[in-house]
Amino acid sequence: DLKLFNDDLSIIFDIFKERRENILLKRENSIPSFLGYNTSAPYGNIGIVENKGFDATVEYNKRFNKDWTLAIRGNITYNKDKWIEGELPEQRYDWMNQYGQNILGKKGYIAEGLFTQAEIDDMARWESLSQANKATTPKPFASQFGTVKAGDIKYKDLNNDGQIDAYDKTYICRGDVPTMVYGFGFTLGWKNLSLGMMFQGTHDAERIMSGSSIQPFNGGGGSGNLYSNIDDRWTEDNPNQNAFYPRLSYGAETSSNINNFQPSTWRVR
């Protein structure tokens, strides 16, 4: 704590580091399924999480005379958490590991953009090759989910095996709890009257959008992210690589275009 200018200015600054152990977790991944637990897997005190950050507050109070006063204040809190130990086993690839990630982190695929018609044509030519020629000709892109067309989302093949699958998922989203929260404001006083304002903000909070937030006309137009950005979409006439909506398709996500409904960086906001 620090006070200056006859205690008009007050500064409080704290640094913290916490290691929390014996966190109760359900052991649904670390116990083999052949043991018969299934959804009734036992809990165990096996989790370890580390938090570190800082907290600061600055406040200035000034009385100019018997009528006028001014108070200015600001605060900021920063916290970064990460898994040290948990119930997940070590993964095949480093990018899949939970440890070192924040506790609300979400996995998904890395989107590299939208497919162009040229890329789709290149894949069609590659598919028409004989097996011998395929072995010596690089595959234009990794196999995605179902049959993809121009305007569909293209995902990154992290392990370079030519197939997008669970081994290409990595942590892409921190979750909806921000790492930083801040605020500032003032209060101006005159006799028995006062005027105050306060501003608040957050930083580094993310969410993977799904459901009605990414499906135009979801619920018959009564719900869904429809009116604000319906024109911000990929079309053959407007092949915008940065469109909010990739190629639109008709029907349920599981039968019509499963590729564009995968959790990915394309949907992180």
In which residue ranges do the predicted regions lie?
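Membrane-embedded beta-strands that build the outer-membrane beta-barrel scaffold
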Residues: 1-4, 9-17, 54-62, 70-78, ...
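Outer-membrane beta-barrel proteins
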Residues: 20-26, 67-69, 81-87, 204-210, ...
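Flexible, solvent-exposed coil segments and beta strand-coil junctions
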Residues: 27-41, 159-167, 247-262
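Residues that define the transmembrane beta-barrel architecture of outer-membrane proteins
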Residues: 50-54, 68, 178-182, 264-269
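Active-site beta-strand/loop architecture of penicillin-binding DD-peptidases
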Residues: 18-22, 29-44, 167-169, 176-180
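Conserved small-residue
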Residues: 44, 50, 61-174, 227, ...
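Extracytoplasmic gating/loop element in the C-terminal half of outer-membrane beta-barrel translocons
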Residues: 150, 202-269
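Flexible, surface-exposed loop regions and adjacent strand-edge segments
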Residues: 27-37, 87-97, 212-222
